[in-house]
A protein has these predicted regions:
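Short beta-strand element of the conserved SAM-dependent methyltransferase core
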Residues: 522, 573, 692, 783, ...
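A structural signal for short, well-ordered beta-strand segments
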Residues: 73, 675-677, 690-692, 810, ...
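Catalytic-core regions of core metabolic enzymes
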Residues: 1-689, 697
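Long, contiguous binding/interaction regions
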Residues: 697-886
Length: 886
């Protein structure tokens, strides 16, 4: 999250080119040429002993001779000199450096040198960066780019050059174009933090091959995506591609899960990437998912409809009033419907009349206009007419419009006109629909992430008991637990298993079966045979003692023949579950090398290919996230929506997934969990067979997770002055209803002091932003009083840290009728202790001069108070280091 040095990299005031040259095709020549041609406003300092001047600019023989320290240095010399030059730049006080090339063997030393001098590095093996708004072309690219609102971050120089060339042809602009190279120091997450606050950037596009820190990426991406759309293309989906790119192995569905969890949108290929660039550059914000299609032919409209149907898109329904107006305005032979086929002889006048009527209606959320080449109706003329209509119509600048002028040669001029007018334009109907559905999916993801989760009922968790059982098993040397051994651990988290007994031989199996009643199931116990099905190690519906004995002996015989060296630890005996009309599912937790623990859901079966057969989510899960996973599984046909007799209980399965998530989050000793099959029968879910792989764990249990979980350890019971006890705890997404009720019990005056304006009502989006926080970046403590199985919020204090984790802005609010009980002070003390322990240096806030109680409290807590009467505010600052010392 660190932003140290990024300002000097992305907004440099001066640049030194180390190894500048007058020899064409040398890196130092190309970099100087591009810097000067780009129109950079600050001094450019070529450093080379070989030339007195480079491209007309006075050169300096070495770094020590520079007249001042540059903000940014670019190493264009032989890689063997990198370390010495970087050390000299650091000693001279340079803040940032772009390293164009360096072998892997240098990486460790280069990073150590940069950290010693508190420098930031872009690269190595970076194409460089372009910032058109500053006239900055610090790259190898010979292609000039226009100013725009789209930022592009790439981990591939080849993809960067391709996008630059493509954008030049379409006269597409960028706010930043950054090629990361090997990301030795500066990485995607830091740039996302910077661009999220950049006023010139309205959308961000990422090309990724790997991640160095998944947790930082998810955190930064989630924060940035709340304000700006972010699209991602990720290569290396197959093992062969991963080997080619030399990237970390990992499940591709895990990337999907992380991208969706952060509120981003993934595009799958280069074709979609180009459509995405066009969309992000020009498309206006989407209000909904209803699409209206206008075309001058049925065939291209049908292609668009097919693509819309395949992506589960939604057509708009025209009102009777709109249909009547269209009938009156258009020729009688035109069928008024959606899509609206104006026929192949549609003139520009027909397009204009249609647009005027549709723009005045509220029947759609996005408008797609298709034009096929026609001798009777030239495309350029219709394009001019459409652009002028959009410009003059009062609602023109608010409509989400997509244009598709089909064909190549005859439509070039029309597409150029649309690009100049800032209207998104695409070559094919399918590409246009793909772009539209990208924005629909992005909007849907953002909306889902802000939905208030339901509070699940009867959630059980006995973390201490589960830990004790796991530690005991590890101390005994166990590395894997089967269904019988794992039962008490699952029961500690409310997960139901079928009662299981262990039999050493066939006679004991018969004895157990007689005790529990028939029919029964027998299952092999062997740590050396990963899949019981390999030796037919599961026998079901055994109804007599003779059947049990024969089945047990048969299992033992098959193991001796197929796996003679395998250890046999007996048999598991279970009452036969009622499978009639039930559905068999599978829930697996595995550790991904990039994103840590993953929760996977699929159908039961012998073969298990999670990339194809399961949907994947990152823990921790709440009820909303678990429900999305189940619904995603149904939509992608990874699980069935119903069995032969019963519909799948989505709420019940969601609650089970939350319980599994809690178990995994709380117990880092768990390496892998496989519940297979999980029998779903109406509202009952029973784990019939479970395998749990375990190992000792030493360290921060949260560090293995890509998303920081709810910090239970920060909960604290506090007694107020009136003797009432309340719970201080971090805020939860489920707190939104209680927070709304709390705000309703705060006076307008107190709300004015807190928000510096009159607040009539908070929207759901406002409250979601307050409750659905990233605990890595923000903390909010609520004081909660429990009454009759309900909770009410009495007060809230909050701190939002900057990306460097140096400063945090704080606020505190207490229910107006509870002042004087010491609640505000206790909440502030809790927040101060947390921010200090979290490594922050300063806590800052503002209030109004007439908020005397807050000013007095701040003074008591050691804040510096700066009364600014002209501004009408009081600045409050607490030095946390001094606070710690005192």
């Amino acid at each position: 999250m660190s932003q140290q040095g990024l300002e000097a990299l992305l907004r440099p005031k001066s640049i030194a080119v180390i190894g500048a040259s007058m020899k064409p095709h040398r890196a130092g020549y190309l970099m100087m040429r591009n810097l000067l041609a780009g129109g950079f406003n600050g001094p450019v300092l070529p450093v080379t002993p070989a030339w007195k001047a480079v491209l007309g600019v006075m050169a300096w023989p070495d770094i020590a001779s520079l007249p001042f320290t540059p903000d940014l240095a670019i190493l264009c010399t032989n890689a063997s000199r990198n370390l010495a030059l970087l050390d000299a730049l650091g000693a001279n006080g340079c803040k940032t450096c772009i390293i164009l090339s360096a072998p892997t063997s240098q990486h460790e030393e280069l990073l150590a040198c940069a950290r010693r001098h508190k420098m930031r590095l872009l690269g190595p093996n970076s194409l460089g960066l372009l910032a058109p708004w500053q006239g900055l072309n610090a790259s190898f690219s010979p292609v000039p780019i226009k100013q725009g609102k789209l930022a592009f971050i790439s981990q591939s120089a080849a993809v960067s050059n391709t996008i630059l060339d493509w954008a030049q042809q379409r006269e597409m602009g960028f706010s930043y174009f950054i090629a990361l190279g090997d990301s030795l120091d500066i990485d995607v997450d830091e740039l996302l933090d910077y661009l999220a606050r950049d006023s010139k950037t309205s959308a961000i596009l990422l090309y990724l091959e790997q991640l160095s820190d998944a947790r930082r990426f998810v955190s930064a991406a989630r924060s940035a995506s709340r304000n700006k759309p972010i699209l991602v293309i990720k290569s290396g989906r197959s093992p062969a591609a991963q080997r080619l790119l030399n990237t970390s192995a990992g499940m591709d569905p895990a990337w999907d899960a992380a991208i969706q969890r952060a509120g981003l949108l993934r595009v799958q290929d280069t074709h979609e990437l180009f459509s995405a660039v066009e969309t992000l550059s020009h498309m206006r914000p989407l209000r909904g998912d209803r699409l209206m299609i206008i075309s001058n032919g049925a065939a291209p409209a049908a292609l668009a409809l097919d693509e819309l149907w395949s992506r589960n898109g939604k057509l708009a329904t025209l009102s009777e009033e709109t249909c009547l107006q269209l009938r009156q305005a258009l020729p009688a032979h035109i069928d008024i419907a959606n899509p609206l086929d104006l026929c192949d002889d549609a003139s520009s006048e027909h397009y204009v009349k249609t647009l005027d009527i549709l723009l005045a209606s509220q029947d759609f959320d996005a408008l797609m206009v298709i034009h096929s080449p026609s001798a009777a109706a030239p495309g350029t003329e219709s394009a001019h007419a459409l652009i002028e209509t959009i410009k003059r119509h009062p609602r023109g600048r608010f409509v989400t419009l997509l244009t598709n002028w089909c064909g190549e040669f005859s439509s070039q001029e029309a597409r150029r006109l649309f690009s100049e007018a800032g209207l998104p334009t695409y070559r094919t109907p399918e590409g246009t629909i793909t772009a539209f559905m990208h924005m629909v999916e992005y909007r849907r993801n953002q909306k889902q992430l802000r939905e208030t989760p339901a509070l699940p009922s009867n959630l059980t968790s006995n973390t201490a008991e589960a830990h004790n059982l796991l530690q005991q098993a590890i101390a005994e040397g166990a590395t894997s637990l089967d269904t019988h051994e794992v039962q008490p651990i699952l029961h500690a988290y409310g997960l139901h298993t079928l009662p299981t007994w262990i039999a050493g031989d066939s006679a004991e199996a018969v004895h157990i079966a007689e005790q529990i009643g028939y029919p029964v199931a027998l299952k092999l116990r062997s740590p050396d045979i990963p899949h019981k099905s390999d030796v037919q190690g599961v026998m079901l519906y055994l109804r007599t003692a003779n059947e049990v004995q024969q089945a047990a002996n048969a299992i033992f015989d098959r193991v001796k023949m197929a796996w003679p060296q395998a250890r046999i630890h007996g048999l598991l005996v279970q009452s036969m579950a009622n499978r009639a009309g039930a559905q068999e599912l599978r829930v697996v937790v595995e550790h991904d090398p990039v994103f840590g623990p993953l929760i996977m859901l699929g159908e039961g079966g012998v073969e298990w290919r999670p990339e194809e057969q399961a949907v994947v989510a990152l823990p921790p899960l709440n009820m909303n996230l678990a429900r999305y996973l189940v619904i995603q599984g149904i939509k992608q046909r990874k699980i069935r929506a119903r069995s032969a007799q019963h519909p799948l209980d989505i709420v019940g399965l969601s609650q089970l997934l939350v319980q599994v998530s809690n178990l995994i989050v709380d117990c880092p000793e768990i390496q892998r969990l496989d519940i297979h099959p999980l029998l779903a029968s109406a509202s009952e879910f029973t784990a019939l067979d479970v395998t749990l792989d375990i190992a000792p764990f030493d360290g921060d249990s949260e560090s293995r997770l890509a998303v920081r979980p709810y910090p239970h350890q920060l909960e604290e019971w506090v007694e107020m002055k009136n003797g009432d006890r309340c719970l201080f705890r971090p805020i939860l997404p489920e707190d939104e209803p209680q927070l709304r009720q709390f705000i309703a019990q705060v006076t307008k005056e107190d709300l004015y002091y807190r928000y510096f304006s009159e607040i009539n009502e908070f929207t759901h989006e406002d409250l979601a932003n307050m409750t659905q926080i990233d605990y890595d970046r923000e903390m909010a403590f609520v004081a909660v009083r429990r009454l009759d199985n309900t909770e009410e919020i009495l007060g809230v204090t909050r701190a939002i840290s900057d990306p460097d984790n140096i400063d945090a802005e704080f606020a505190v609010l207490v229910r107006s009728d509870l002042k004087g009980l010491g609640l505000g002070r206790r909440l502030m003390e809790k927040l101060i202790a947390y921010t200090r322990d979290h490594g922050l240096r300063r806590l800052n806030g503002i209030t109004m001069p007439n908020n005397r109680s807050m000013v007095a409290l701040a003074r008591k807590l050691g804040f510096q108070v700066d009364i600014q009467l002209e501004e009408g505010i009081v600045g409050l600052t607490l030095n946390l280091a001094q606070c710690d010392e005192s």
